[in-house]
Amino acid sequence: MKKAVVLGLILVAVYAAGAWALWPFNKTTENIQPSVKGNRHSQSFYAVKAEMLDKVYYDHRKTLYCNADFTAHKKIIKPDGFKIPNLRQIDFKVYDISPEDLQRKAERMEWEHIVPAQNFGKTFTEWSKGHKNCVSGKGKAFKGRSCAEQESEDFRYMYTDMYNLYPSIGAVNYLRANFSFTQFDARQKNTFGRCSMKISRNKAEPPNQVKGMIARTYLYMQKTYPRYSIGEPAYSVLKAWNKKYPVSKWECARAFRIEKVQGNANMLVKKPCLERGWYQDNWR
């Protein structure tokens, strides 16, 4: 009897100490824990863009929204049917750009923050109010992105998080601006010809094939950086997209490569990729 009691106490103690984690559960999901660690790899946006090109997108040079090819020198090869819109056709937004400059932007690839920098930047006082060191050579105080990037290490790490960066046609990136994503009525027309990216009334809807990737990027940023919150109604839309549009082999390889470089995982991507056996460098 005493031996049984002692043995029972030992088992309880072992369980409480966490030895249960050694039990051989399903190998595709064992030891997977939500990641709360964010980017601590680089604070240089310039350096990170080069790494994205050379270490992540080296064999998948396609833009996110319109699936356009781009070269190692970031020159866009426009897909068939891609068109630059008449800016007057996009409701409620006045763009400070000439048609000629917009056309030039359509010819180059840019790295887009899927969660716009302004959305999380405004949570930093350096962005919203400035800093005593944010003074120009002419003695004029400034705030916003320039001040946050100059004075806040935490902002720089969020700004250069590789999971939040995707290649985009420059004109699409410019017109999407800092708009949140939504689900338009089915009657809403494409903004860029055959590319099914839609922008209207200061909102945007991406093509179906990338809605899952976008949702998992937003949800990762909110989970990893608690100062950022998505808010409604966007949060409900993104949660629905995450459920409806599962990971692809490319999304899995992209996350695998970023983890190798940046050091932390996006578990919203990694877990389903592991379950499918797709969390690896090869995506073809």
Predicted regions: what is each one?
Residues 1-107, 125-134, 185-201, 278-284:
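Nuclease and nuclease-like effector domains acting on nucleic acids or nucleotide cofactors
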Residues 100-284:
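Domain-level detector of nuclease and nuclease-like folds
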